[in-house]
UniProtKB/Swiss-Prot annotation:
Belongs to the glycosyl hydrolase 36 family. One of its GO terms (biological process) is polysaccharide catabolic process. One of its GO terms (cellular component) is extracellular region. It catalyses: Hydrolysis of terminal, non-reducing alpha-D-galactose residues in alpha-D-galactosides, including galactose oligosaccharides, galactomannans and galactolipids. Its main location: secreted. Its EC number is 3.2.1.22. The active site is at D485 (nucleophile), D547 (proton donor). Glycans are attached at N23, N166, N456, N657, N673. This is Probable alpha-galactosidase G. Its cofactor is Mg(2+); NAD(+). Homotetramer. The lineage of its organism: Eukaryota, Fungi, Dikarya, Ascomycota, Pezizomycotina. InterPro entries: Aldolase_TIM, Alpga-gal_N_sf, Alpha-glycosidase_related, Glyco_hydro_36, Glyco_hydro_36_C, Glyco_hydro_36_N, Glyco_hydro_b, Glycoside_hydrolase_SF. Gene3D superfamilies: Aldolase class I, alpha-galactosidase from lactobacil brevis, Golgi alpha-mannosidase II.
Length: 726
């Protein structure tokens, strides 16, 4: 949360006449109904204010007073004089895209339930949240709109969504519908996004908001590696710990668009929502947008991130594992790739158990009968164990593995598998039987990527097949972990609305399976972090953050990902060196410390290739990871120094009650003839006393204002310090 000591005293939702105020700990979000036009006008989104807000004086230019593109609007339309990016575009039966929604009524509802529309969303009871529903009508077209605002005061957060209902007698087409559109009166802002590609996701990009529209998003059918459905607005002077920051995060896993527009008048508009819609809305039907989370922070970018992290852990992620420690795992992929069978997997499990690993994950290569999955060009869709590799099926192997005792533990080994149910290889029995189940556009060639095609998740028969196939696997053996992959984008979509329909079908499958198997740890993956978004976190409590397991690259990726997402949702592994993606060699401890910054910690290697010293050191590193895991999973994060700005990136996790902490401090490259690097902590109490790895006690003021010095030697140094309040 933004300020752990602050207490909100205003009602979360206050209505005075037709002025609406949403209040948080340090947040005010206000808008009103313009009396002449019944249009919703934005007043303020920022720090707490009280009392009336003066109406903005309209600029006076001969003949142009009162033009719609010169005022701040809450639900801006298209075609009636506002030439900025609209919040929606509806093609009417007559062919035009003119709409005129006017305020009709409002309702205040305690709490917030997950949407019944099939989309993921936040939830909370009356103590956590209050929802304002504003209803609008277009008297010329018989269309109705609802804008929903849920305020979570503790997190200085407003969650917005929109819906359109067709009350006319003709079809209309929803060509776009933003989940949120907000106008700021400021003209000197900067925007921060997360850009990247495969194996280099979530790299920060901070740039000036200049005149015109700056737009980014995804057209791949999933949120993608290229851009994340998140953007922050900040003042040029805002830092990690000081200044105002606004964060916008879309609860959606499909194609999306974020527009940041600075108008000729110096107003700044942010709109965010799904893209590639073109959704036909028949009479009596309603179309719902995804939800967008809007966070305000008066304590810098770090405060914004902590609000998002807390909200997502408590009010978005439904899995019980969202706030529980995850077992240390070993994934077979980089150790064995496709070269797996029952003997190799049992040998891997034995060696993992001897190291103290609690969970063995069998990655790709275990399935396919007539088309064995011995490479990536066959087998997807045929979810039965390969009889040549697993002649007795999975159940006996799983029973043998789960009977293994883990060294230095009272627990037995657990077992997990990799799947990619949304895909199919042309070389598979499933495709031969159901070629019509894949996305395709008439007679056009079906584009393969990674030798695979995409199943049409909007089809009920496809959904039922996946639910049945996955349920059969999980019912047949004691499998307690599933890594769910998604390795390509959507192509040859059969209709303009197919991308959104695909996501609705996928969400239904996720919901059914995670509800049916609540004791399974579900991990999302899309060639790494290609679908790391709030929508997926509703169902899967963790995501494989990147296919790049190089520790140096992972520092940038994990620091970037933490801008919007909690460490509890990240997966990080110790892999072998030289690293398989970069060829870089880094020390074991450095690799381990980087991976420990994730809620799911593990190894991705073949233990048979470990050196004697690595074999001796890994059990202690596993024990350390398990010791700090409750703080990383449940605690709050302070990014003390960013890898983009410093040779010594650092981060601090503090427990919820602020009595324990873990400091991560890294050196990327040596610096000759230079004073020892110093790190100043944050989030402590000035007058409290703390011990650092047992030394001290030191005052919180000393640790925050002077800090600690550590010595490093050579490339890729790391320090992990345990902090405890007396």
């Amino acid at each position: 949360m933004t300020n752990s000591k602050a207490r909100y005293v205003l009602e979360p939702v206050q209505v005075t006449g037709t002025t609406f105020a949403l209040n948080g700990t340090t947040l005010s979000y206000q808008f009103h109904v313009d009396e002449p036009s019944a249009d919703l006008r934005s007043d303020h989104f920022g720090g707490s204010i009280s009392g009336p807000i003066p109406v903005d004086p309209e600029p006076i230019v001969d003949g142009w007073t009162g033009m719609p593109d010169r005022v701040r609007r809450e639900f801006p339309d298209q075609g009636r004089g506002d030439f900025r990016v609209p919040a929606f575009r509806i093609r009417q039966a007559e062919g035009h895209t003119v709409s005129a929604f006017r305020y009709r009524e409002h309702e205040i509802v305690p709490g917030k339930e997950v949407s019944a529309s099939g989309l993921p969303g936040v939830f909370g009871d009356a103590h956590d949240a209050t929802t304002l529903i504003v209803r609008l009508v277009d008297p010329y077209s018989d269309l109705a709109a609802e804008l929903k605002y849920t305020v979570f005061p503790k997190y200085d957060t407003v969650v917005r969504s929109a819906s359109i209902t067709n009350k006319s007698n003709s079809d209309v087409t929803i060509e776009s519908l933003a989940s949120l559109s907000v106008d700021f009166p400021f003209d000197e802002l900067e925007m921060i996004g997360l850009r990247g590609d495969w194996a280099r996701e979530a790299h920060r990009l901070r740039r000036k908001v200049d005149y015109g529209v700056q737009s980014f998003g995804s057209t791949t059918g999933f949120s993608s590696h290229l851009h994340n459905p998140f953007v922050a607005l900040v003042h040029p002077s805002t830092t990690e710990s000081q200044g105002e920051a606004w964060g916008f995060s879309l609860i959606y896993s499909g194609s999306f668009t974020i527009n940041v527009e600075k108008s000729s008048q110096g107003l700044t508009r942010v709109s965010i929502g799904p893209s590639q819609l073109s959704w036909t809305l028949k009479p009596g039907e309603t179309f719902d947008s995804p939800e967008c989370v809007a966070v305000y922070s008066s304590t810098g970018i770090g405060g914004m991130s902590r609000s998002l992290h807390g909200l997502y852990r408590k009010h978005l992620m439904k899995s019980k594992f969202a706030t529980e420690d995850r077992p240390v795992l070993l994934n077979s992929w980089e150790g064995l790739y496709f070269h797996i069978d029952q003997d190799r997997m049992y040998r891997l499990a034995q060696e993992a158990a001897a190291l103290g690993v609690k969970l063995l994950v069998m990655d790709d290569g275990w399935f396919g009968d007539e088309h064995p999955r011995t490479s990536d060009d066959a087998g997807l869709g045929d979810w039965i164990p390969n009889p040549a590799r697993f002649p007795d099926g999975l159940t006996p192997l799983v029973n043998r593995i789960t009977a293994l005792k883990v060294a230095n533990s009272q627990r037995n080994m657990r077992f997990g598998i990799w799947v990619e149910p949304e895909m199919v290889n042309p070389r598979s029995t499933l495709y031969q039987q159901h070629p019509d189940w894949v996305l395709h556009a008439g007679n056009y060639p079906r584009t393969e990527q990674r030798n695979q095609l995409v199943l049409n998740m909007s089809l009920p028969e496809v959904q039922e097949f996946i639910i049945s196939a996955m349920s059969e696997i999980l019912n047949a053996a004691d499998i307690t972990y599933v890594k769910w992959d998604h390795n390509r984008g959507l192509a040859e979509t059969p209709s303009p609305c197919a991308n959104h329909a695909y996501m609705l079908g996928a969400y239904r499958v996720f919901d059914v399976l995670t509800t049916r198997f609540p004791n399974v740890i579900w991990e999302g993956c899309a060639s790494g972090g290609g679908r790391f978004d709030p929508g997926i976190l509703q169902y899967f409590p963790q995501v494989w953050t990147s296919d790049d397991s190089d520790a140096v690259e992972r520092i940038f990726i994990q620091f970037g990902t933490s801008l919007a997402y909690p460490a509890s949702a990240m997966g990080g592994h110790i892999s072998s060196v030289p690293n398989h993606q970069t060829g870089r060699t880094t020390p074991l401890t450095f690799r381990a410390h980087v991976a420990m910054m994730c809620g799911s910690f593990g190894l991705e290697l073949d233990p048979a290739h470990l050196t004697d010293s690595e074999r001796r050191d890994i059990p202690g590193l596993i024990a350390l990871a398990e010791k700090i895991s409750p703080i990383v999973v449940k605690g709050d994060l302070w990014r003390l120094a960013l890898p983009e700005d410093s040779n010594w990136p650092a981060a601090l996790f503090l427990s919820e009650n602020r009595t324990q902490g873990v400091l991560f401090f890294f050196q990327l490259a040596p610096m000759v003839n230079h004073s020892l690097p110093r790190v100043r902590l944050q989030g402590l109490e000035d007058g409290a006393l703390y011990r650092v790895d047992g030394e001290g006690p030191y005052s919180g003021s000393m640790l925050m204002n002077l800090g600690l010095q550590y010595s490093f030697r050579g490339d890729y140094g790391s320090r992990l310090a345990f902090i405890e309040r007396e």
